[in-house]
């Protein structure tokens, strides 16, 4: 099971990858939205913002997020690490329910370029 530190590092790596992206991926990463990433097996939520092509984590809280972020991810810690490391295909994980992504329709259309 991934630790909180490993999950935070995975989010940082994802953020770095997004900032270095080009083309459609860079455009999708340019959104300015609130973000939450709930790690179910650790019962922790990373709260932050997607801005300037990066995910900036502002807070880590126990349990579910107190407010609904504009972009919401939910998954196990190992799945987050595997996704960022390229060992888990997002589409398959999302289709099987291992990973949940919730956002407005317009944001979902943009985010599919990222994922």
Residue ranges and their predicted role:
Residues 1-115:
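Feature captures hydrophobic
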